[in-house]
UniProtKB/Swiss-Prot annotation:
Superkingdom, taxonomy of origin: Bacteria
Function: Catalyzes the removal of elemental sulfur atoms from cysteine to produce alanine. Seems to participate in the biosynthesis of the nitrogenase metalloclusters by providing the inorganic sulfur required for the Fe-S core formation.
Residues binding pyridoxal 5'-phosphate, per UniProt: 71-72, 148, 176, 196-198, 231
Taxonomic placement: Bacteria, Pseudomonadati, Pseudomonadota, Gammaproteobacteria, Pseudomonadales
Residues given in the record as [2Fe-2S] cluster binding sites: 319
Active site, UniProt feature: 319 (cysteine persulfide intermediate)
Keywords carried by this UniProt record: Iron, Iron-sulfur, Metal-binding, Nitrogen fixation, Pyridoxal phosphate, Transferase
Name this polypeptide is given: Cysteine desulfurase
Gene Ontology biological-process annotations: amino acid metabolic process; nitrogen fixation
EC number: 2.8.1.7
The reaction(s) this protein catalyses: (sulfur carrier)-H + L-cysteine = (sulfur carrier)-SH + L-alanine
Residues with N6-(pyridoxal phosphate)lysine modification: 199
Cofactor: pyridoxal 5'-phosphate
Assembly and binders: Homodimer.
Length: 396
């Protein structure tokens, strides 16, 4: 029986057509696109088309597209908004991807002031609180478009408009949003936007959208890839162009069929498994993402048993990296620790089938029951009221 892959918010399988599009640029068309000879010209024209393909998905001009090595490098473009001669404050959220949070923590250690917007129990932001922080001391706002754990969507268009009106640069990490949601930047107030190929059924390349007129300070010197330094990774960039077109072609499928399968997965599990619930904003989230909290057990244990039966998912907990704390996203949402430890993220793609979802719905309930039978929080058919000190809460 084939394995079931439901960890597409971590990375995606490479589209077969995209592999075919890449191959010639490893063998026949291998020139440096900056060269004047025909080998370089061939690749240069292909890169121009890839830039246009990528721009077409986002609705912006191809001159505003910069290719990078990954989404994290694109996220670090927020450094370009900072200067000792200008404002020193940053605004982000407590639930950002580590690519942004770790950078903000580093900047805080260097003397910058970082304001982290809190979220409510559904992972939503308070725009009134956000508005109160917009002032002349703020240099840049960086807010993800969609949360990678819960799929909760943030109102980045409105937040960008508010920042722009205050004269503040706005960046969004759209890595999780781009293949699943229509994005049109033509009339947007967003100054910078980050993407990653490996969430688009492509590997090894990132994209930075930089609105024309936005100041940008290079982190890596060189001239080849516009404001970013370094010779272009031609095969990966060209594949990214194809990935962009394929994402646009499958957009409706993501928002109808993938969402239907996601909803079926959630309903099927919750109908059978008691003391479980979906985290995040139920009305405003990605169509492919289901983050389910299974109370009174450990998410990592669920993942290990799922893996034994050929199902790949991921946990909201950081335990696999040596920490016993739930993820920063679950803690920020104030999910009870008996539930936050048991979160599992199922993230679907256009390759997910009905049969796979049916299989997951069959396999999850007995795994949860097996783990609860050995949990100090569980006895018989329900939770223990006073489990003692077997597991102490790791946060308030």
């Amino acid at each position: 029986m084939a394995d079931v892959y439901l960890d597409n918010n971590a990375t995606t399988r490479v589209d077969d057509e995209i592999v075919e599009a890449m191959l010639p640029f490893f063998t026949e068309q291998f020139g440096n696109p900056s060269s004047l000879h025909s080998f370089g010209n061939q690749v240069g024209l292909a890169l121009k088309r890839a830039r246009q393909q990528r721009a077409g998905v986002l609705g912006e001009h191809d001159s505003e597209i910069i290719f990078t090595s990954c989404g994290t490098e694109s996220d670090h473009a927020i450094l370009s908004a900072l200067s000792p001669a200008r404002a020193q404050d940053l605004i982000t959220t407590v639930v950002e991807h580590p690519a942004v949070l770790s950078l903000c923590d580093y900047l805080a250690s260097e003397g910058y002031t970082v304001h982290k917007l809190p979220v409510d129990k559904k992972g939503r932001l308070d725009l009134d609180h956000y508005a109160s922080l917009l002032n002349d001391d703020v240099a840049v706002v960086s807010v993800m478009w969609a949360n990678n754990e819960t799929g909760t969507l943030f109102p980045v268009e409105e937040m960008a408009r508010m920042a722009d009106e205050a004269g503040i640069m706005f960046h969004t990490d759209a890595v999780q949003a781009v293949r699943k949601l229509p994005i049109d930047l033509k009339n947007s107030s967003i100054h910078m936007l980050s993407l990653s190929g490996h969430k688009l059924h492509r590997k090894g390349v990132g994209v930075l959208y930089l609105r024309r007129g936005t100041r940008f300070r290079r982190c890596c010197r060189g001239h080849q890839e516009r404001p970013a330094g370094g010779t272009e990774n031609a095969a990966s960039i060209i594949a990214m162009g194809w990935a962009a077109e394929r994402a646009l072609a499958f957009m409706e499928h993501e928002n109808t069929e993938v969402k239907r399968l996601r909803d079926k997965l959630e309903a099927g599990i919750l109908a059978v498994v008691p003391h479980a619930f979906v985290t995040g904003d139920p009305d405003n989230r990605l169509p492919n993402t289901a983050n389910i909290a299974f109370e009174y057990i450990e998410g990592e244990a669920i993942l290990l048993l799922l893996n034994k039966v050929g199902i790949a998912a991921s946990s909201g907990s950081a335990c696999t990296s040596g920490s016993l704390e739930p993820s920063h996203v679950m803690r920020a949402m104030d999910i009870p620790y008996t539930a936050a430890h048991g979160t599992v993220r199922f993230s679907l793609s256009r390759y997910t089938t009905e049969e796979e979802i049916d299989r997951v719905i069959r396999e999850v309930p007995p795994i949860v029951a097996q783990l609860r039978n050995v949990s100090p929080y569980w006895s018989g058919n329900g939770p223990v009221e006073h489990p003692g000190k077997a597991f102490a809460p790791v946060y308030g």
